Amino acid sequence: MSTDPTSKPAFPITDEVRHALAVTKRGVDELLIEEEFAQKLAKSAATGKPLRIKLGLDPTAPDIHLGHTVVLNKMRQLQDLGHTVIFLIGDFTSLIGDPSGRNATRPPLTREQIESNAKTYFEQAALVLDREKTEIRYNSEWSMPLGADGMIKLASRYTVARMLEREDFTKRFQGGIPISIHEFLYPLMQGYDSVALNADLELGGTDQKFNLLVGRELQKQYGQEQQCILTMPLLEGLDGVEKMSKSKGNYVGISEKPTDMFGKLMSISDVLMWRYFELLSFRSLDEIARFRGEAEGGRNPRDFKVMLAQEIVARFHSQADAERALEDFNHRAKGGVPDDIPAVTLAGAPLAIGQLLKQAGLVPSTSEALRNIEQGGVKIDGATVSDKALKVDAGEFVVQVGKRRFARVTLTA
């Protein structure tokens, strides 16, 4: 036994603790420091005091997509183990703008944008988290009262040299790309959140590792027990290349219609499907490994893609919605028209095909409409449109763009 009076008592690593550690580690990129976290779990089990687990999200956009749920799923697993989950809305840090992974300064949001986005943030996150067991906090609670004096004192706790250890800052500095002083404040303020919340564990994407470590360092300086950090992989988007992002158009929003969600998930590659199983499915790793073995043995990978799509749709909607989405998908695959397509009434016949598609809400612009026509992706009542100069006469007809976009159009003069 250690004679060091500052050493902490060791708590027994029981089977319960080993199970909790295994649940925690599933699908993670990194857990720092694992031995410390095992002791935190052991202490929690021995004392009955739950750990305080923090996830901060800046409301930079109003919608949450499946990429966000990778870390939310992990929060739910930890919540189900009995720990306290803190869903931290970064309404103050959003005013600064997170520079993580950026090669240029990210423009900060306005207060109005932040408040608007934050309204829907937790409602969507609650589709994953247990609402009754989640503590919701806003970091403006402790960041706003700091004032200039407190901000300067906080800034004195970290050096510019340490900030430049961060890869994205280093690249910008070496490349002569400007770095604003306020960007150095972001990791400091995120780290200070951990001090204010006395966090035991903080979660984030792999691009957040530096910021999470700042929190650990600040806790030490403030005399707190240091948080452990857990980073989750960034989910690739539908293209399988870049990370899922609304701005890149390769995302699946968790509030999308069941049919749209199902169709998007069925569009991913067979290779990407296994990545989605690992990061998004709640099935056991043994079951996923068995599925993969069956696919390699000759079973159609589509069977497993359907299972994945149904599981995810059911989670955010219902099992009945998932079944209907499958029926709808199979119907469309056979060339059928879905039952629930929107009805649109337009005027101005004869109307240019590009304008018709745009006004019907099937494309964002006429240039996008013309591109789809060039690719043979536009149909009127099942007939492919090839003439980009087509003028559509008055009447009622079904218009289709791509595989999933339909509208029942009534066009008048």
UniProtKB/Swiss-Prot annotation:
GO CC terms of this entry: cytosol
Positions with a binding annotation for ATP: K246
GO MF: ATP binding; RNA binding; tyrosine-tRNA ligase activity
EC number: 6.1.1.1
InterPro entries in the record: aa-tRNA-synth_I_CS, aa-tRNA-synth_Ic, Rossmann-like_a/b/a_fold, S4_RNA-bd, S4_RNA-bd_sf, Tyr-tRNA-ligase, Tyr-tRNA-ligase_bac-type, Tyr-tRNA-ligase_bac_2
GO BP term, example: tyrosyl-tRNA aminoacylation
Domain S4 RNA-binding: 351-411
Principal location class: cytoplasm
The keyword Amino-acid biosynthesis appears for this protein: no
Keyword tags: Aminoacyl-tRNA synthetase, ATP-binding, Cytoplasm, Ligase, Nucleotide-binding, Protein biosynthesis, RNA-binding
Keyword Cytoplasm: yes
Motif placement: 'KMSKS' region: 243-247
UniProt cross-references to CDD domains, sorted A to Z: S4, TyrRS_core
Catalytic activity: tRNA(Tyr) + L-tyrosine + ATP = L-tyrosyl-tRNA(Tyr) + AMP + diphosphate + H(+)
Subcellular location: Cytoplasm
Family under the similarity heading: Belongs to the class-I aminoacyl-tRNA synthetase family. TyrS type 2 subfamily.
Stated role: Catalyzes the attachment of tyrosine to tRNA(Tyr) in a two-step reaction: tyrosine is first activated by ATP to form Tyr-AMP and then transferred to the acceptor end of tRNA(Tyr).
Pfam family, one: S4
Protein name in UniProt: Tyrosine--tRNA ligase
Assembly, per entry: Homodimer.
Motif ('HIGH' region): 59-68
Biological classification of the source: Bacteria, Pseudomonadati, Pseudomonadota, Betaproteobacteria, Burkholderiales
